[in-house]
A protein has these predicted regions:
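Signature of uroporphyrinogen-III synthase
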Residues: 2-258
Length: 258
């Protein structure tokens, strides 16, 4: 009789907090290692409240020297809006250089048939600034970003270097209404081995939803649950809200937790 393979995460119960449309690919990573996955969709992603500033920037997109994407959502919503305006990101990429922060962001760009002109060695904003291939002086830089909650570090640093930076909201992340019942049941029964956060917003939205579902004592249900984060900014928010971080990915990706 064949013995079952003892996988690294065999039968571990893990909650993944992600946007609703981004959870599937991440689940596969952990399911392939033997884990049982519970969904906690902590973000829903859509256009910003006001689309006009994005349209104005996209109508002048060929005037920019560089576009800097710090998230996959930025790529998706810029391309989606360009197509509405009878263009595409791939078409624009023939004339403009593109830099990305993050391995997943670079992978998303690849899926659109576009090769990034610059990817920093580490998947954080500071690495992009420290290793950017040319001086920022005189550059016109387009920074599509989340409407609320993102960092201004890249924009500030390029402005300080003498760039003209156009920073506009390309998308907004909002908090969903509720948590799936099976996930709540697993938390109530204290069956969750680990909970994974990939951004500050997934931390704050998860906390909001957990308190809404479980009441003021919500944190006590996670006493036996390891809190895992991807990246230093996520860890900071997790410390502030949950009071601890049990492990941070060495490489700032989901795979970096394995």
């Amino acid at each position: 009789i064949m013995q079952p393979i003892d996988l690294p995460l065999n039968q571990k119960n893990i909650i993944i907090t992600r946007s609703k449309d981004g959870i599937f690919d991440v689940k596969k990573i952990f399911i392939n290692k033997g884990a049982n996955i519970y969904d906690l969709p902590a973000l829903s992603v859509g256009y910003p409240d006001n689309i006009n500033p994005l349209d104005e920037a996209l109508n002048e997109i060929n005037d920019f020297h560089w576009i800097i994407f710090s998230s996959s959502n930025g790529i998706k919503f810029v391309d989606k809006r360009l197509r509405y305006l009878n263009s595409s990101l791939k078409e624009c990429s023939r004339k403009i250089k593109i830099a990305v922060v993050g391995e997943k962001t670079a992978k998303t760009l690849d899926e659109y048939g576009i090769k990034a002109d610059f990817i920093p060695p580490e998947f954080i904003a500071e690495s992009l600034i420290d290793n950017f291939p040319i001086s920022g002086y005189g550059l016109k830089v387009f920074l599509p970003r989340v409407q609320s909650g993102g960092r201004n570090l890249i924009a500030d640093e390029f402005r300080n270097a003498g760039s003209r930076v156009v920073e506009v909201a390309a998308y907004e992340t909002r908090c969903p209404e509720s948590i799936p019942k099976e996930t709540i049941d697993a938390i109530l029964n204290q069956k969750v081995d680990a909970m994974i956060f990939s951004s500050g917003k997934t931390v704050s939205n998860s906390a909001f939803l957990l308190e809404k579902e479980l009441g003021r004592e919500w944190l006590t249900f996670l006493n036996q649950t390891k809190l895992l984060t991807i990246g230093p900014q996520t860890s900071k928010v997790c410390h502030d809200i949950f009071g601890r971080v049990d492990s941070q990915a060495q490489k700032y990706t989901f795979e970096g937790l394995l």
